[in-house]
Each structure stands twice: as structure tokens, then as C-alpha cells.
Regions:
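Compact, well-ordered interaction domains used in eukaryotic information-processing assemblies
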Residues: 97-129, 133-136
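Mixed-charge, glycine-accented linear interaction segment located at domain edges/termini
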Residues: 159-214
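Generic structural signal for well-ordered, non-transmembrane alpha-helical segments
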Residues: 105, 109, 151, 176-183
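Intrinsic disorder
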Residues: 2-16, 32-33
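N-terminal low-complexity, intrinsically disordered segments
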Residues: 40-106
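Compositionally biased, intrinsically disordered low-complexity segments enriched in Pro/Arg/Gln/His
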Residues: 14-17, 23-25
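An exposed acidic His-Trp-rich patch
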Residues: 124-174
Length: 214
């Protein structure tokens, strides 16, 4: 993302607007401004997850968009383009995009769906059988890859260097943070776009993936 695009990250319940520079699609240092959550128990290591996004000025929403009446397809594929990242802030590593055209609401929506897909085994965190899911990007052949074993989820991407290990979080943490990210993102977008808060698709989305207790 070229310097000057607006990136949004959260810390606690506060939201910040910061200027960031993203030139390459890489696994890189995680940002210092972040919303965090942590659990302990995987080899006694604390894993701290931050999910964030930026909106790109290169791919603005179509003029005269009626956000109140926008359909699911428009909300997921045509609006709110930018970039996203998932970061392990303790290890200072993240999986991020840098295209500028990723529909960030669609990413948040799909991430919540994927977390549920990874929880189909009735044995839950006792299951040693791996469970897989992919997040596809519509304008690219690249994918973000998710693999769950027991209660832990490895996250990698096609564009990561082959020698780089995935970032890893507990499934419980990923579920909670994905939903927090979705609700924080919706709050940001409804602040920026008149009528979006009255869109029935947004109501349904919030009801489908409510926030979870810490």
C-alpha cells in the first residue's frame, strides 16, 4: 500500500488512524498499535493476535453508492477496498496483503466463517485430525491457508517464503478476535458512510457473529 493510505488498527476499545507504508507482500514486522488478546498453554508461549485493515485511496467506492440499500454482493465484493493483516504481536510477525483492492468487510466476514468451518469436529480441541480451510482472493490466485490441530490454528499464505513458519493462535482466541475485528470494522465503516448502519445485511451479519466474552 503506498504511503499516505489510511490504516486502521485497534488497541483495547480505542481505534486509531495511522499512516503506514506497505510496498511488498511479505511476512513483516507487526504494528505497535494493536488490539490484543492472549492465551497461554501451547509450549508455555503467549500468543497475542492483532487483526487489522487499511482502506486504499486507489480503489474508492463507486460514487453515489447507496449504503443503506447495498446488497450482500456489493458489500462483499465492490466496496471498502484496502488491505488486511493478521499479526502475532509477541513474535513481531504478520501475514498481510499489499494489493490495495481486498474488500475488507468481505475478509472479516469470511474469516468468521472460516473459524466456524474449523470447528466442525465434535471432539473440538481433543481432535488430532487436522482440519483445513482456505480464504481465496477474487482478483488473485493467492490464498490464505488455515490448518487446525487440537485447539491450535496455523495461518500461512501462498505468498509467504517457503522457509517461513506459519503464525499460530488458539482457535478460541482466533474466534473471539475475528468477531471483535468484524464488529470494530463495521463500527468504523458505519461512522464513515451514512446509511450503512441501517442496512439489513449488516444487521444480519452482526447477529450471526456476535461478540464473544473475553
Amino acid at each position: 500500500m503506498p504511503y499516505g493510505d489510511v490504516a486502521t488498527s485497534s488497541y483495547g476499545k480505542r481505534r486509531h488512524l495511522v499512516l503506514r507504508q506497505r510496498r511488498y507482500l511479505v511476512l513483516r514486522q507487526a504494528p505497535s498499535l494493536c488490539r490484543t488478546g492472549s492465551v497461554t498453554g501451547h509450549d508455555t508461549i503467549d500468543y497475542v493476535l492483532d487483526i487489522g485493515y487499511s482502506l486504499s485511496r486507489r480503489f474508492p467506492d463507486p460514487p453515489q453508492t447507496d449504503y443503506r440499500r447495498a446488497g450482500v454482493r456489493d458489500l462483499r465484493h465492490d466496496l471498502f477496498c484496502g488491505d488486511v493483516y493478521l499479526a502475532d504481536t509477541k513474535a513481531d510477525r504478520e501475514v498481510s496483503t499489499a494489493w490495495g483492492w481486498v474488500p475488507v468487510l468481505d475478509f472479516a466476514w469470511a474469516l468468521c466463517d472460516i473459524v466456524e468451518q474449523l470447528d466442525q469436529d465434535p471432539r473440538g480441541s481433543r481432535s488430532a485430525k487436522p482440519q483445513f480451510a482456505e480464504l481465496d482472493f477474487t482478483e488473485s490466485t493467492d490464498r490464505m491457508l488455515f490448518e487446525r490441530r487440537f485447539g491450535w490454528v496455523d495461518i500461512a499464505a501462498d505468498w509467504m517464503p517457503v522457509e517461513e513458519p506459519p503464525i499460530t493462535f488458539s482457535h478460541r482466541l482466533l474466534r473471539r478476535e475475528a468477531r471483535d475485528f468484524l464488529h470494530d470494522l463495521i463500527a468504523d465503516l458505519t461512522d464513515m458512510h451514512d446509511g450503512l448502519a441501517d442496512n439489513p445485511a449488516i444487521w444480519d451479519l452482526q447477529a450471526r457473529f456476535p461478540r464473544l466474552p473475553s
